[in-house]
Every structure is written in structure tokens, then in C-alpha cells.
A protein has these predicted regions:
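Contiguous, well-folded functional domains in the mature portion of proteins
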Residues: 2-171
Length: 171
């Protein structure tokens, strides 16, 4: 059962399907890939919500990192939850404590339940508005059901463009 199922009381998805190939998640926003523990938020940095990485964000658009379904777009628009067609749950959380901005600086380009292809724009981000509100602009990429999946490896490092492979899964 993944994080969103636990949070919203949904039922667990049937077994995650892997076709024997290494699964890959693409970087959803331009920036510098950093280890999860370097994020300026203890909840993300300690991997309580799942394994992943951080991104010192430089881009202003969040793209779908894989083919899948948008599972969550909070009213505050600061994050997007997704489920890949292969069963990978990913939380893309832009900025730290940006829920406090109540949507200012964010424009949603999608909605919950939307089926999207990798590279589909999901969210526009105003990094200056985040900074002006006194929040770090780092983005957390969290595989919220990482305990239910094969071993995850962060394969991107340093400056990277959206669309660069960032996570791979091994059997």
C-alpha cells in the first residue's frame, strides 16, 4: 500500500508490474540533483515519506516524469502526486513549506485523474514568488511506495535538464 492509499484510505493497488526491464523516472524540472538528505526539510530529508532525491530548482515548469495518472493536485498547487502505468507513486513537491503560499506562485496545468504522457507540462512555478515568500525553492522527488518496489537508484547527479533519467529500479 502506497503513501497516497494510506493518507486517503484508498485500497492497495494490485501487484506492481515490471516487465524485466529497469524502470526509469525522468527528472520533472530543470535543476541540480542533490541527495535527499540535503533537502532543507527533515520530513523529506529523513526519507519518512519514501526514498528519492532533491532538486535545487532552476526551471519554471514541472513535467510528467513518466506515462501515468495525476493522483493529487492540492488546492495550494505546490505539489503533484502521480502514479506511473507501472505502479510507481511519485510526489513532486516544489519548494519547502510552500503549502503556506496557498497557491500564489503556482499555476496548475493539469487536474486529478488526468492521464498524461512523459513530458506533459503539469505545473508552472514562479521561483521569485517562492523566494519572496521566504521559502527554499528546492523540489523533493519522493517515491512514496518505494518500500513496495525493487531497489531504487538515483542515476542523475548535478545540473540536469527535465527529461534526464533520475531514478531507475532494479530487481
Amino acid at each position: 500500500m502506497g503513501f497516497f492509499d494510506k493518507l486517503f484510505g484508498g485500497k492497495a493497488a494490485s501487484e506492481t508490474k515490471f516487465s524485466g526491464q529497469k524502470m526509469t523516472v525522468m527528472l520533472p524540472i530543470d535543476g541540480k540533483v542533490i541527495p535527499l538528505e540535503q533537502l532543507p526539510d527533515e520530513t523529506f530529508a529523513s526519507a519518512i515519506m519514501g526514498h528519492g532525491c532533491g532538486v535545487e530548482t532552476t526551471g519554471d515548469t514541472v513535467y510528467a516524469p513518466f506515462d501515468g495518472t495525476v493522483t493529487q493536485v492540492p488546492e495550494s498547487l505546490h505539489a503533484v502526486g502521480m502514479m506511473s502505468d507501472d505502479g510507481i507513486e511519485l510526489l513532486i513537491h516544489v519548494g519547502m513549506d510552500t503549502v503556506e503560499m496557498k497557491g500564489q506562485g503556482f499555476t496548475s496545468l493539469t487536474k486529478e485523474g488526468a492521464k498524461v504522457k512523459a513530458g506533459t507540462p503539469l505545473l508552472k512555478v514562479d521561483l521569485e514568488a517562492i523566494r519572496a515568500a521566504g521559502h527554499p525553492t528546492a523540489t523533493a522527488l519522493i517515491v512514496t511506495n518505494s518500500d513496495d518496489l525493487p531497489e531504487i537508484s538515483v542515476v542523475a547527479n548535478g545540473d540536469a535538464a527535465a527529461g534526464t533519467p533520475v531514478f531507475k529500479f532494479k530487481k
